[in-house]
């Protein structure tokens, strides 16, 4: 597959994952940036494209793409281990890590992928933390 075909294929996959609101925003942004000759005839009119995308979106189970990781509490006997883990995970200093665990609950990450959120949760739980993953409202 050539690069253009691969790009188009990935683009279509990403578009299929979008909600109707996201598609509407993309359409408006494209309309602002692209000038199309008034003589250009579309294969389908805008309304049928919008209705088709609504049908696809409504029939498809949409999985949230972004998640937040919230550190709720920790086992006090594993405080030092958790501080070390936090310093490694979010690249903060010792004082910042200590301050963070003193003011729980705290959001550690916002808008991360599901896989990253699950891996991070596992790492934090191994360090004695109680962690919640919430959906990021898009």
From Swiss-Prot:
BP terms from Gene Ontology: translation
Listed InterPro entries: Ribosomal_bL12, Ribosomal_bL12_C, Ribosomal_bL12_C/ClpS-like
Domain of life: Eukaryota
Any one Pfam family match given in the protein's UniProt record, by short name: Ribosomal_L12
Keywords (A to Z) from UniProt: Plastid, Ribonucleoprotein, Ribosomal protein
Principal location listed in the UniProt entry: plastid
One Gene Ontology MF term: mRNA binding
Gene Ontology cellular component list: plastid; ribonucleoprotein complex; ribosome
Localization in the cell: Plastid
Keyword check for Ribonucleoprotein: yes
Ion transport among keywords: no
Function: Forms part of the ribosomal stalk which helps the ribosome interact with GTP-bound translation factors. Is thus essential for accurate translation.
Similarity comment: family membership: Belongs to the bacterial ribosomal protein bL12 family.
Oligomer status and interactors: Homodimer. Part of the ribosomal stalk of the 50S ribosomal subunit. Forms a multimeric L10(L12)X complex, where L10 forms an elongated spine to which 2 to 4 L12 dimers bind in a sequential fashion. Binds GTP-bound translation factors.
Protein name: Large ribosomal subunit protein bL12c
Species classification: Eukaryota, Discoba, Euglenozoa, Euglenida, Spirocuta
Gene: rpl12
